[in-house]
Swiss-Prot record:
Residue stretches spanning the membrane: none
InterPro entries, sorted: Ribosomal_uL14, Ribosomal_uL14_bac-type, Ribosomal_uL14_CS, Ribosomal_uL14_sf
Entry keyword set: Ribonucleoprotein, Ribosomal protein, RNA-binding, rRNA-binding
Pfam family, one: Ribosomal_L14
Subunit structure: Part of the 50S ribosomal subunit. Forms a cluster with proteins L3 and L19. In the 70S ribosome, L14 and L19 interact and together make contacts with the 16S rRNA in bridges B5 and B8.
Any GO MF annotation of the entry: structural constituent of ribosome
Xref: SMART domains: Ribosomal_L14
Cross-referenced Gene3D superfamilies: Ribosomal protein L14
Organism: Xylella fastidiosa (strain M12)
Function, as annotated: Binds to 23S rRNA. Forms part of two intersubunit bridges in the 70S ribosome.
Family to which the UniProt record says this protein belongs: Belongs to the universal ribosomal protein uL14 family.
GO annotation terms (biological process): translation
Full protein name: Large ribosomal subunit protein uL14
Length: 122
């Protein structure tokens, strides 16, 4: 579960290393985001010659969480850390590669590009 002020790693090659959630999108009093949800983030740490700079604000989709996601069969998919993929204004990934596994819950119409870039889908 991701909430405001949560720090997440970045699972793409956009140039950001760490981002902080500043808003959970979807509803005025929505408090938590889980895998597949879109959040508003600010870049807290970036590499020198990346596509994004420290302090910039982007949309991001949560691809991995420590709390995990429960499947209909009762199994729980859990990860070691929280991670997100940065999106541009058209909700397309900024980076051209996605690092680490992602879950099958991302297989919606608007997020298929992230699933196709990922090396492993759990």
């Amino acid at each position: 579960m991701i909430q405001m002020q949560s720090y997440l790693g970045v699972a793409d090659n956009s140039g950001a290393k760490e981002v902080m959630c500043i808003k959970v999108l979807g509803g005025s009093k929505r408090r938590y985001a889980s895998i597949g949800d879109i959040i508003k983030v600010t870049v807290k740490e970036a590499i020198p010659r990346g596509k994004v700079k420290k302090g910039e604000v982007y949309d991001a989709v949560v691809v991995r969480t420590r709390s995990g996601v429960r499947r209909p069969d009762g199994s729980l998919i859990r990860f070691d850390g929280n991670a997100a993929v940065l999106l541009n204004n058209k909700q397309e990934p900024i980076g051209t590669r996605v690092f680490g596994p992602v879950t099958r819950e991302l297989r919606s119409e608007k997020l298929m590009k992230i699933v196709s870039l990922a090396p492993e889908v759990l």
